[in-house]
Design a protein with these regions (language model features):
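C-terminal beta-signal and adjacent terminal beta-strands/loops
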Residues: 575, 677-686, 710-765
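Gram-negative outer-membrane beta-barrel transporters
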Residues: 465-470, 570-573, 593-686, 762
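Short, acidic, small-residue-rich periplasmic hinge/interaction motif at the N-terminus
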Residues: 36-40, 47-52, 81-85, 95-143, ...
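Flexible loop and strand-edge segments within Gram-negative outer membrane beta-barrel domains
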Residues: 288-308, 314-375, 381-404
């Protein structure tokens, strides 16, 4: 533990010595600007203005005006963006002899084609220019669907589906293109700090009021992120201090007229007048009572009491350098089962966890030569202290404790070249080291698991920009301590972009999954009155993948309407695919074993479409058609000495999708209709409540939601919004739930909540 902190401390000590060649800043150098709407010439307030070369940013005031002061003389590129408008970029020359004045006229854009993302190449780039398809879930989406946490948001990203895998504790998991959770990598500000343990309930422990946006890359895509991201990458970008502001909100929710939930959130952002330092703070409180859908006395949605707090701060020693710090803490208690007024060991079933999570990070960015060269040094750490009870039939020995420490450190370099072989190019390279130390003890299950995962990585990529073509070639070398030989993972992306309205992409990537414990291994499912554990088979080999994808992206406008259609095809081939087989009782414990199968293929198509008429009305929908099949039928259980097999991957529908429809029929009134569709799938149903194990085929589900909000302008530009609505209006919910203490808690599928009513208040400045 001490070595880790010494290493991070050493990185921090290097920071002050890395910008000794920074140019001297002279007083009086200034940019003064004005942002207006192109069609009406009305002022645009709260537009974001960024100096591309330095990363320094500000926001326009109520009159659309902005300033930058104390700048070093030279040429700068300003990029202006605002919600609902196309991004505009202009160059300006700063001199000590005069104030540079610049004006921006922004055109309406309600389909976000100019949105800036970082997950494609770790460098800021417009979404339509990115070499891979990047989908974005923004704060606007969170409000449209009234999502309290990340788990409730990801269903509204094409190709993603969030499911609840436990009837007791509510273990959520996100699938990308049909591949289960461990195939995907969840990042916080591009850092792989989410461990297997934090992945068990992590999607519900991240409140949306800490999130600026979520960027999703389906498939391997970029070599800069882990090669274990076979399914894709979910990159959570937290809120950064940009301007002085605050917000506070509260929301009351009722589940099917039976159970209540309360959410309270607050955000504060403070920035110095010269924009050289700032801090953004968030806090969230959530309290949910257990919900029993079928009246058997056992919960379908568990009790949650959650407190989160965090901050992100920065300091700019010079205009071309930035030091960033962040800290997050979570204190959560969740419990599912029955007899909530008694101790867990006095209940028939209880799955209970108490988490204390502390994480933090530091990063130092330095640019030079007009910011055409940049180096970033970073380190992040997370510690989890979990106490748990996964037991049934009043078992006094089902208590457990888990200690989990994850840390990552590294450095990246990015350089722009006027010519590399045959065209201008951007090179990115770096090194990264991450370690996870896990100790999980449950006496009643004879479990004392220690796992130490160490991964050293080096990566590089080069992107050639040939005007209408862009070619990105990259590779990553990973040395995993649980795998004998280093793993080389190449990635290739080709982008054809004849104009801003049409892009076509081709991608090839490889990846792997190591033979280690994943999130579901650290969760004990209650089946038939006893806990079921997962163990790794002897000689388990790493899983390898080869992925291909291609897409076409077309944007058009007609009159005041804008439209965008994205069609994407994907194919992933898995070798030594991991499968779970129920092997019965071993040493008085029910065991499922993770083994290597022959292989699998996952292929299909995603459709993403948007159409908008200004801010009056906007429709967005996503739909996925896919197949997830093993190459040969794999055994999943044995009943009466007969092996039950399946060639179809479990819990993966062939068809699923979503839609959102938003409208502002009158000023200050916002209406939203949204929904998700989940097609039929197969789900294993284990004996306990039923006599023998069997495979079930689920029905189709359609979840429909409605929300209305009205905003009042109070004193001094303070806004008050009142909102209310209904989620899952049709009460589309699983109808064949197991009941009682012998139920299979893993037999849980479909929408994650019943018909739900909510009302909320939000105050912002």
């Amino acid at each position: 533990m001490n070595r880790i902190f010494y290493f991070i401390f050493a990185l921090c000590c290097l920071v002050p010595f890395m910008d000794i060649n920074a140019s001297e800043v002279k007083e009086g150098n200034k940019i003064s600007g004005h942002v207006i709407e192109d069609a009406t010439e009305e002022n645009i307030a709260f537009a974001s203005i960024l100096i591309v070369e330095t990363g320094e940013g500000t926001m326009s005031n109520e009159e659309g005006q902005f300033t930058f002061t104390n700048l070093t003389p030279g040429k700068y590129t300003l990029r202006v963006s605002a919600v609902g408008y196309q991004t505009s970029t202009k160059e300006v020359i700063v001199s000590k002899d005069y104030i540079a004045v610049i004006h921006f006229k922004l055109k309406l854009d309600n389909i976000a084609i100019d949105e800036v993302v970082v997950s494609a190449s770790r460098n800021e780039i417009k979404r339509w220019e990115a070499p891979v398809v990047v989908s974005v879930a923004s704060e606007k989406l969170f409000e449209t669907i009234n999502a309290p946490d990340l788990a409730k948001s990801l269903n509204y990203v094409t190709g993603l589906r969030v499911e609840n895998n436990c009837q007791n504790c509510g273990f959520p998991q996100v699938r990308i293109n049909g591949l289960e959770g461990p195939y995907s990598q969840v990042l916080i500000n591009s850092r792989p700090i989410i461990s297997a343990l934090s992945g068990v309930y992590g999607l519900e422990q991240i409140p949306v009021n800490m999130i600026e946006r979520v960027e999703v890359v389906r498939g391997g895509g970029s070599a800069l992120f882990g090669a274990n991201a076979v399914g894709g990458t979910v990159n959570i970008i937290t809120k950064d201090p940009i301007e002085n502001s605050f917000s506070i909100s509260t929301n009351m929710t009722n589940y099917n007229a039976k159970s209540w939930e309360q959410n309270v959130g607050a955000n504060v952002s403070l920035v110095s007048k010269d924009k050289s330092y700032g801090i953004a703070i968030y806090e969230n409180y959530r309290n949910r009572n257990p919900y029993d859908h079928d009246g058997d006395g056992f919960s379908e949605l568990g009790k949650i009491n959650l407190n989160t707090f965090g901050l992100r701060t920065f300091y700019r020693p010079t205009h071309t350098s930035r030091l960033s710090l962040e800290y997050h803490t979570t204190n959560e208690t969740r419990r599912g089962g029955n007899k909530f007024d008694q101790q867990p060991h006095n209940s028939d079933i209880t799955e209970q966890t108490k988490h204390i999570i502390n994480s933090g990070g530091i990063a130092y960015d330095l640019g030079w030569k007009g910011y055409r060269n940049k180096i970033s040094v970073f380190a992040s750490i997370q510690h989890i202290d979990r106490s748990s009870y996964y037991g049934a039939q009043r078992d006094p020995n089902a208590y457990g404790n888990t200690d989990d420490l994850t840390w990552v450190a590294g450095a990246t370099y990015t350089g722009q070249m006027n010519k590399c072989l045959f065209s201008p190019a951007t090179f990115t390279g770096g090194i990264e080291y991450q370690e996870n130390r896990l100790h999980d003890v449950i006496i009643g299950y004879n479990r004392d698991m220690r796992q130490d995962v160490k991964i050293g990585s080096a990566f590089l990529q080069n992107e050639w920009d040939m005007r209408i073509f862009s070619l990105l070639v990259g590779a990553r070398l990973d040395k995993h301590n649980l795998i004998k030989n280093p793993i080389f993972s190449p990635r290739v992306n080709l982008l054809f972009k004849p104009n801003k309205k049409f892009q076509a992409r081709l991608t090839y990537s490889t990846g792997f999954r190591a033979p280690q414990a994943y999130d579901e291994d650290l969760h004990v499912t209650a089946v038939g009155g006893e806990g079921v554990q997962i163990r790794l088979a002897e000689g388990l080999k790493e899983e390898r993948s080869n992925s291909f994808s291609g897409s076409v992206d077309w944007t058009t406008s007609f009159g005041h309407w804008q439209a965008n259609i994205l069609l994407e095809g994907f194919y992933t081939d898995l070798k030594n695919v991991f499968i779970l087989e129920d092997i019965g009782i071993v040493d008085n414990n029910a065991i499922k074993e993770r083994r290597n199968g022959k292989g699998a293929r996952v292929y299909g198509a995603n459709l993403d479409a948007k159409i908008a008429h200004g801010s009056d009305i906007a429709l967005q929908l996503g739909f996925t058609a896919q197949r997830s099949r093993y190459k040969v039928a794999e055994t999943w259980t044995v009943v009466n000495n007969e092996e039950l097999t399946t060639k179809r991957m479990m819990r993966t529908p062939d068809y699923y999708g979503y839609f959102t429809l938003t409208s502002s029929p009158v000023k200050m009134l916002d209406l939203a209709l949204s929904g998700t569709y989940t097609g039929s799938m197969i789900v294993p149903h284990y004996a306990g409540y039923i006599e023998n194990d069997r495979m079930e085929t689920t029905p189709h589900f359609f979840e429909l939601n409605f929300k209305a909000g009205y905003t009042f302008i109070l004193h001094d530009h303070i806004k008050l919004q009142l909102n209310a609505g209904v989620q899952n209006i049709l009460n589309s919910f699983q109808s064949d739930l197991d009941k009682g203490e012998f139920r299979d808690s893993g037999y849980f599928y479909g929408p994650t909540q019943p018909r739900t009513y909510f009302v909320g208040i939000k105050i912002t400045q």
